[in-house]
């Protein structure tokens, strides 16, 4: 059987305990099941056969209960009950499970559960919030970095001054001969000058394009072939020859009619002419030549 008074006299009443921490003001207890963290008779988990406490494991709160019936079984000494994440429901669970426990233990369990929930909420807020990470540096490293920065600034100022001087001399045309200057700065100055000239030429081209806006031009059709043009020329020639034939036939008919009228007038005598005089048109004669291929002589065998 477990005797609480005997255990307390041996452990807590000015005797040795492995969980006890002595200070000038009071004594503390390092046992994980201690409900208050103080070393006294009412809060000692070893000297109380009916005991309860609250523990947190990986963000989840559990209620641990100990009864005298399980004192003979150390493997089943503590009964664990998982508490709800809702604060009010968890308090109701504590009241339901600790009906027959002392009021002091019930009150301290609720108080411990409140503290645990508060620091869990604070942990969640800190994890979501960004924090500054302070990295300590030695004095030697700081001095070295400052010297490097100063040297880099001086070198940058010197390079800028050299570039400005090169640009001024290049504009003035002072480089008739070869000089021993930094090649990179000289090349950079030349590139800047080339960029400026290229921008001017592009501006001139844009002005020319603006001037050409609104002009009208005739463009040859790419779909017309030379064979089509030759066909059109042949058609024109045929049309011209047909017109000439018509004109020649008309002129011949008119001349024959005039001759007949003249013969009639001579036979009847002179008669007064009526109407307008008919003027004779110039007569055009057209001759056509046909070329025939000469017959080849038969070879005498």
UniProtKB/Swiss-Prot annotation:
Q: Which GO terms describe its cellular component?
A: nucleolus; preribosome, large subunit precursor
Biased composition of type Basic residues is found at: 265-282
**Which parts of the sequence are annotated with region: Disordered?**
191-301
What would be one Pfam family of this protein?
Mak16
**Acidic residues bias (residue ranges):** 202-212, 219-234, 251-261
Query: Any idea which UniProt keywords this protein has?
Result: Nucleus
Q: Name one GO biological process term.
A: maturation of 5.8S rRNA
Spell out the subcellular localization from the entry.
Answer: Nucleus, Nucleolus
Q: Which InterPro entries match?
A: Mak16, Ribosomal_eL28/Mak16
What is the similarity comment for this entry? Belongs to the MAK16 family.
* Name this protein carries in UniProt: Protein MAK16 homolog A
Record the organism: Xenopus laevis
């Amino acid at each position: 059987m477990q005797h609480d008074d005997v255990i307390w006299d041996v452990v807590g009443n000015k005797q040795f305990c492995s969980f006890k921490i002595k200070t000038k003001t009071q004594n503390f207890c390092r046992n994980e099941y201690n409900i208050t963290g103080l070393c006294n008779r009412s809060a000692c988990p070893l000297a109380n056969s009916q005991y309860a406490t609250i523990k947190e494991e990986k963000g989840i709160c559990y209620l641990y209960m100990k009864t005298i019936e399980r004192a003979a079984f150390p493997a089943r000494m503590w009964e664990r009950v998982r508490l709800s994440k809702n604060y009010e429901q968890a308090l109701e669970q504590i009241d339901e499970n600790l009906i027959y426990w002392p009021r002091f233990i019930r009150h301290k369990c609720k108080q411990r559960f409140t503290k645990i929930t508060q620091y869990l909420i604070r942990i969640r807020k800190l994890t979501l919030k960004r924090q500054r990470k302070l990295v300590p540096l030695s004095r030697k490293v700081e001095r070295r970095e400052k010297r490097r920065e100063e040297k880099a600034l001086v070198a940058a100022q010197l390079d800028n001054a050299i570039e400005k001087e090169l640009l001024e001399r290049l504009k003035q045309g002072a480089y008739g001969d070869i000089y021993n200057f930094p090649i990179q700065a000289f090349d950079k100055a030349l590139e800047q000058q080339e960029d400026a000239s290229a921008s001017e030429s592009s501006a001139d081209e844009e002005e020319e394009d603006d001037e050409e806006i609104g002009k009208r031009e005739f463009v040859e059709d790419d779909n017309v072939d030379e064979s089509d043009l030759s066909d059109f020329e042949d058609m024109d020639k045929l049309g011209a020859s047909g017109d000439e034939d018509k004109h020649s036939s008309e002129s011949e008919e008119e001349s024959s009619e005039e001759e007949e009228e003249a013969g009639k007038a001579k036979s009847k005598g002179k008669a007064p002419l009526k109407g307008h005089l008919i003027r004779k048109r110039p007569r055009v004669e057209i001759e056509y030549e046909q070329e025939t291929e000469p017959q080849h002589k038969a070879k005498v065998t």
